[in-house]
Structures are given as structure tokens and as C-alpha cells.
Amino acid sequence: MFLPRLVRYRTERFIKMVPTRTLRRINHSSRDPIQKQVLALIKANANLNDNDKLKIRKYWSDMADYKSLRKQENSLLESSILHEVKIEDFISFINRTKTSSMTTRGIYRRECLYQCKKNLDLVNQVVSQVSSVRHQKPLTTQLDTMRWCVDDAIGTGDIVMAADLFLLYYRLFTDDKKLDEQYAKKIISVLAYPNPLHDHVHLVKYLQLNSLFESITGGGIKLTRFQLETLSNKALGLSNEAPQLCKAILNKLMNINYSLTNDLKLRDDQVLLAYKSIDENYRRGNVASVYSIWNKIKEHYVSISAHDSRIIYKVFKICTHNRAYRSICSEMFWQLTPEYYCNNPLILPAIIDFITKQDSLTMAKELMQNINRYTLPENHHIVWLNKRCLSSLLRMHLKFNDSNGVDRVLKQITTNFRALSQENYQAIIIHLFKTQNLDHIAKAVKLLDTIPPGQAMLAYGSIINEVVDWKLASKVKFTDNLMALVNDLLTKAHDFDPDHRNSLWNVVSALYIKKLCHYKKRDGKFVANAKKDIDLAKLLYINAAKRSKTYWTKSNCNPFIASSPCDVKLKVNNQNRFTILRNIALSALQIGRTDIFLWACAELYQNGMTIEELKLDWNFILKHQIRNSEFKTNKEIIQDIKKHGVSAVKRYLR
């Protein structure tokens, strides 16, 4: 299955280590075993070139595979070059080249580890002659040796090597089950310091150290608040370059062990870290991640109203706009007290928008009663009469055909703000379109002509969305004439925004892919072009994603009328990437194009979705029994997906 291979590829890329296949391709000038070739390098006492360094790395790779050495009945000590070389030659080579070569510094440190179990005298002889400390205290145990190697590496700024030496020690000596947490924390402290050129490698090393502790002790390394904060900031700094690594780090940090006796505020810091992660995934449109993280932290406080209102708002907004996740909005609405949301100018409009999308008249009546009952007099102007709240109320009254409410809100808007906003125009125009009455549509178009393009861009996007939906539903009497309207709107939008910076163009690109991927069945079979269109959707996405700059003109601003696929130009960025890929993947799954489905999942993975989030997302989208279930924890969700999940998703995303 390709997703695990993808994980390996990206990890290898982040560590920037030489892949095993490269080590195998080393063109050795000698047929001697690699150990003898390294010995020859040391005896020659010459400077190391790149090919020499590859030989040394191959030797290290062989030595780390201690199980293979045992099968060959060779001891670790006998396989070590320090066992074969004259100590004088070894020390001479090390002291001459160690200042300029990190590889040289790696040689003597690793050789000390190889020898430390059975030949501490030799180790001390090496340490006394290469150490920068004048009066080095003799090492008495193999653990002392590991600690000296780590300290020596940190002292010369070889931070990644310090982590590698720690990991190597416990790989070589598997009988030592008591992990040195003190030194692990010491290494993590230096890994946590900002180092832009190596931040990604440092974070991978943290994951490897933490994984070692999880495998042996059952729990990760306990961190201080400083380590938690610096590692999280490092990860967030790589959110664009390496979203999957960022996600892995944040997930670990949100679930690390902490001690109440040592740091009472660490758990609160983890909640703040979860907020940062929600914020990052909200920005990317990764609703599955936002849902999962919120589910982890929602019960941290006695009441969810104790959480940061900005986070509650973002959870409401992203889940409202993704139909499959609206159950969490319903849960939050009933858990929040009316006294809280009726006096919160950020949360109240989000709740109104959710109820409008949910089309629940019962909830709308409950909300309006609560607003009248619980809004404090001093908050009335701040909450009720702010622009966002009035826009949300206008949409709600339009949704439920409350003409009196619409008139009242419009009067308040014009009284307080003198003119309608683009959100207000959008709400009125799209309401007229949704009636599917030709007279009302004509009124909407007439109103649209009176609005400057800068105020009408939101309405343009909503109209095009509506027309595309009608087209997909084969409502010919509307779409035949209105496709000309779409072209007119996009031409006006291009004249106003020739560089296509407005979010309208993100919407247009996503809608074009949605239309392209839509399939129809005739007599139980897919129409002939369904599979070709899904290939075209993939090609258009790839071309748009890799294109650094597009030169927009009137001839390419409307993809819906392009005469050839070559003429279609789309805009793909973090604002619409997830929507486009999910549409492609969903259609591919439904028409049996497993290859395209897996490709789209791989793209989503590379842009920050974990395999667990992909499974959650597809099960929520495809299976109403799962999305409508009431889950208390993420563990319950995982168990339910394992038991009742979509079989195709189980089969493909293993």
C-alpha cells in the first residue's frame, strides 16, 4: 500500500540522511569488506572526501544492525575498527581532522559506544586523548560512555549526532531497559532551540526519541513548559513547508505525559497548543483535524464556554460549512448557556449561521427567545447591532421567509451603517435565486447591476455556485440562459480584479472541478466520459498546483466556457485545495477509479491530513450512521469506524 511508503519517503526527506539504496551503490575501489576500507582510510591519515564519508556511513549502518552481526557470530567489539587499528594511528587521524570534519567526530564517539561494554580501558584511552576537557574523569560504566559521547557532541554543536548516539546506544544494548530520561531531556532541550536550517531534522529526532520511550516505557518523554512551547513553535514554523511533520509533532505534544507536581500549568499549555493546531488546520480547511482536536480538549474545562471564544467560533464556522460535521455544532449549541452566547458578539453570529444552514425552525425560535431573554441591556448594542450579527440575522430571516424580520433587520442596517454591505447584498440576491422563480431571478439580476463589482464579488460566487448546482441537477430551463450570466459576472470580476487576488477565484476553481467530477448513471452504468473527466480533473489540479504564476485574461477567466482542456486555467491554494481534492477523491471512489482516489488521498496527506483523519473524513462523508452518532471521545470514533466503517475506505487506507 502506497501511503506507508509515502510516510517513509517523507521521513527520509526530512532527516536528509543518505538512503540505504545510495549506500549500496557506492563504487568501492576495493573488493575488501567495508571495515577494511575504513581502516585503510584511517591508516592513510588523509582528509576525507565525499566517497570516503559514504563508506564510513555504510560501516555505521552495518554496525547499527547488531542482530545481523550476531547471526554472523561476530561480536560488536570484533567488528569495530578500533579493535583492529593501532591506537596511535587512530588518535593521530582523529586529532588531525576532528576540528574540520563532523564525520571524524562521529567515528571516535561511535567507536567508544561499540567498545564500552567489554573494553572500558580502551574507551578511556581514546577519551583521554581526544577530549577537550583536560582532566577527564575516567568512565566506569557503559552508561557513562553514552553520556560522555552525548555531552561531547553537544559541546561541538553536533546536535543531531547527540540524538543519534543516544538512539544508537539503546539499539546496540537492548538489555538496558532503563532509559536515561535525564539525558533524553537534555538532548530535547538543545533540539528545541530555533535553528532554521535544521529545524525539520531536529523535530524528526524528537519524534524518534519519543518513540523509543513509548516502545519501552509505554509513554513518551515528559517535557517542561519551555520544551513544549519551543518545540510547538518550531513545528508551526514548518506548517507550510512540512505540514505532515508539523501535524505529527503537534499531535505528540498535545498528548505528552506531564506531572502535576512539577508543573501545574503544563496541561493548560497543551490546550493552548491544541488551539494553535485548530487555528492552523482551520486556515487550511482541514475540518477532520479541527473536529478531532476539539474532541480531545472540549472537556478539559467544566464548561466548554471556558474555552477561548475564538476557537469555539472557528469550530462552529468550519463545521457549519462542512455538512458531515454539523452534529458537533448541534452539540455545542445545546452545551453553551444562553447567558454566554447571547452576550458574545463573536459566537452569536456563528450560531445564527449554523441554524440557518441547518434549516431548523425549532432551533431558530429557541435562539430568538433566548436572545430576547438573556442579552444584557449593556450588551444590546454591542451584540445585536454589530455588522456581523445583523448580516447573520438577515440571512436567517430570509431563510425562513420571515418578511417582517427581514424588514426590521434591513432598517437597523441602514440606520446604523447607512448602506448595505456585500454580505447583505449576497444574502438578498441568493435568496431570490433559491426561490427558483424566474421573476425573482430577474429581480436579483437587476439588483446585481446596481452594485459596484467590489461590493458584489461575494454575490457573484454564490450565484455561480447556485447555477452549477442547477446544472448538475439538470434544471435546463434555468442553466441555459444563466450560463451566459455566469460569463458576464466573471468578465466583470476580471475587469475589477485582473490579478485574481479575490477569494471568488478560489470558489470558481473549486466549482469547476465539482462540475467536472460530477457523474451520471444511465441504466445503472456510468456515462462514457465520467472516467475521462476524472483524469482531466487530476491533470488540471496538478498543473494549477505547480504553476507559480498565471497570466489571467478575459479569455481564460471563465473555465466553464473553455473550448479545450488546454485553455482551462484554475487557481489552487490553501483556501480551496482540500475542497478540490475531496471532490476528486469522492467521485473517483464512486466510479471505481481507485488509482485517482489514492492519488487524491496522498495529496491530502502531503498537505497535512493524517491517515486517521482521512479515514474519519471519508466515513463521516459517506456514512450517516457514523457522522450522526454521539461520540464522547476520539477512541470511541476510532472503534466505531473499525467496526462499522465504509468497507472501501478500510480496504484502501490501511
UniProtKB/Swiss-Prot annotation:
Cell compartment(s), UniProt: Mitochondrion
A GO MF term: mRNA binding
Key word Coiled coil present: no
Any one GO CC term of the record: mitochondrion
Alphabetized UniProt keyword annotations: Mitochondrion, mRNA processing
Superkingdom of origin organism: Eukaryota
Main location: mitochondrion
Record GO biological process: aerobic respiration; mitochondrial mRNA catabolic process; mRNA processing
UniProt KW Cytoplasm keyword: no
Other remarks in the entry: Present with 2180 molecules/cell in log phase SD medium.
Job description of the protein: Responsible for conferring a stable 5'-end on cytochrome b mRNA.
Stated name of the protein: Cytochrome B pre-mRNA-processing protein 1
Organism in which the protein naturally occurs: Saccharomyces cerevisiae (strain ATCC 204508 / S288c)
